[in-house]
Amino acid sequence: MNSLFATTAQGLEELLRSELETLGAASCKVALGGVHFQADSRLLYRALLWSRLASRIVLPLNVFSVGSDGDLYRGVQAVDWPSLFTVDKRFAVYFSGTNAAIRNSQYGALKVKDAIVDSFTRHGARRPDVDRQQPDIRIQAYLHRDQVMLSLDLSGSSLHQRGYRGAAGQAPLKENLAVAIVLRSGWKPGTPLLDPMCGSGTLLIEAAMIAADCAPGLTRPYWGFSAWSGHDEAQWQESLDEARARTQTGLAQTSSRFYGFDIDGRVLEKARHNARRAGVAALITFQTGEVAQLINPLPEGQRGTVVSNPPYGERLESEPALIALHNQLGRVMKSQFGGWRLSLFSASPALLGALMLRAERSFSAKNGPLDCEQKNYLLAETATAPGSVEGQIATDFANRLRKNVRSLQKWVEREKLDCYRLYDADLPEYNVAIDRYSSWVVIQEYVAPKSVDPERARQRLYDVINATLAVLAIPASRLVVKARERQKGKSQYEKLAQKGEFLLVEEYGAKLWVNLTDYLDTGLFIDHRIARRMLGEMSRGKDFLNLFAYTGSASVHAGIGGACSTTSVDMSRTYLEWAEKNLRSNGLVGRQHRLIQADCLAWLAMAQETFDVIFIDPPTFSNSKRMADTFDVQRDHLALMAQLKRLLRPGGTLMFSNNKRGFQLDEAGLAALGLRAQSITDRTRSPDFAHNRQIHLCWLISHADKDTFKSCH
């Protein structure tokens, strides 16, 4: 009897133990990452041919402590290597793990190799050759907590490599993990199995091989035991003959049928190719189709199991398409597959909440480095009638959004706007803002207070996303989701992503670039559009200054409005480059359109030029490392006005705006400075922000001895 160890993915050890016991293995003992068991040659070959869950089956040779490289060398030399393979066989060492003595796995492999070679030369034999590509003998050395387990790998390549998969989709499952998913799904051989997002078909192919009693190892071209001295060729051939006979009989007798769907026809061709190589193509029907159009292929009354590994994203809030996909899947399951079992395996378990289904059981497993979860559902026997997303969830939100769209439609068409707000936390339980940017939509989720259950908040976001897609009839690929909280200092300028994708939009004749994904804000504050149009009208023949210029949209309006010059000052090089791009897109090039990178407050204190029109929309608060002092708009606005007065020409106009809730303009202080102000907040608030009286505050300010407001009415 041989003492063996079968490895598997973490989380699958108990399944592997059960499988090995079914094959006849004795003394099975579960360990982290595998199962120890006893087997003679016949059972060893059966396990190699028939185990669907094992990654490797190895023969442990020695376990020893390593406190130095000398300990490693001596522990390897303690094995009688010439009794395991002959000198004419090529070998390779695969070493994993480090400790204080062996700090590099390559060094560890080298020491093991040297010890093996020296074992042969010590007995007068020549040095055996090393072959890393396809060795005859594979030696595994695993170092963990100063203990080395030295083994002979009898598998060769990993057992999950059945030999049938020539190509896979973007994120293939390993075959042994696919088997675990199928086994845990509750599917029984002889009953239908369907995968609505089957990719390269691994789940279906492995299930078909189970149903047809196909030995998974039959199609493997390479084994690690062939050059092992303990190999029994006659017993191996007998095991092969038995496996071939069982496979042939099983394929002829199975009544199981399998159905695979995927939106990508090219990936389905790979799936068909894989199924042919595995010998189960006759059992599986592959068809191109997307989840939303999925129809139950079985006659009414027949039941089966749906198993799938849906796509997932690392950042949930940036993947509205995935949220929509999961919600569509849940709706289709309820409407088309009443009475079926559903089992989904995901590296983003939170996405499964979008199914709107209650799981009856869940399992944990690793897919490579990813922590994953498999959830099983029993679908209600009575199928629900297909309906729109908003008809089933978030009805009040969907109705409000639809009402807003209708009420704004004529105004949007009249103003010829690409960008406008559709919803602004109108209903407290759906605390989001929804903005349209041409054919794109941005949902900004205001972060819920800590008193709100995170799961409930996430579910409401799912509802908002799906209802928005349905009401606006846009593809999920045109939806962007962001989380917004109260901004502090420079956080509004921090980068969220690295896509670098820009969209050109129009606003009252100005062409402006927006970026919907990379930053919290898009590069265009759409609540200020009327203020920007006013600046354009005010700036004809004038010199225009834009402080805290951001992406320069106000400078663009001034420029196309006929300003003699524009000067845009901002501390961010990124935003000034963006502003230059905006200016160029409107033909505003040349020395008369200046871009200055500077701390606006420091620049203002030093500036000697004067201007006819000044626009300033400062941050509510700033403590940037590149600014000498903090800035608070309520505390410091009078000092700011005193500096701006120096730069404002006689008869000139200053537009001052800010977003601080509860801000109070110190009109008495302004009068003491020789300035006067006129509130234009209501005039600059457009219909899409009519219900948000706190979106911004805005004033026109001029020298007290000049009447400059008449032309702005």
Swiss-Prot record:
SUPFAM superfamilies: S-adenosyl-L-methionine-dependent methyltransferases (SSF53335)
Name of the protein this chain belongs to: Ribosomal RNA large subunit methyltransferase K/L
Pfam families associated with the record: Methyltrans_SAM, RlmL_1st, THUMP, UPF0020
GO cellular component terms, A-Z: cytoplasm
Reactions that this protein is recorded to catalyse: guanosine(2445) in 23S rRNA + S-adenosyl-L-methionine = N(2)-methylguanosine(2445) in 23S rRNA + S-adenosyl-L-homocysteine + H(+); guanosine(2069) in 23S rRNA + S-adenosyl-L-methionine = N(2)-methylguanosine(2069) in 23S rRNA + S-adenosyl-L-homocysteine + H(+)
Compartment(s) where it occurs, according to its Swiss-Prot or TrEMBL record: Cytoplasm
Main function: Specifically methylates the guanine in position 2445 (m2G2445) and the guanine in position 2069 (m7G2069) of 23S rRNA.
Swiss-Prot/TrEMBL keywords: Cytoplasm, Methyltransferase, RNA-binding, rRNA processing, S-adenosyl-L-methionine, Transferase
Domain of life: Bacteria
Main location: cytoplasm
Cystine pairings recorded for this chain: none
Domain named THUMP: residues: 43-154
Keyword Ligase among record annotations: no
EC number: 2.1.1.173, 2.1.1.264
Family: Belongs to the methyltransferase superfamily. RlmKL family.
Molecular functions per Gene Ontology: 23S rRNA (guanine(2445)-N(2))-methyltransferase activity; RNA binding; rRNA (guanine-N7-)-methyltransferase activity
Organism: Sodalis glossinidius (strain morsitans)
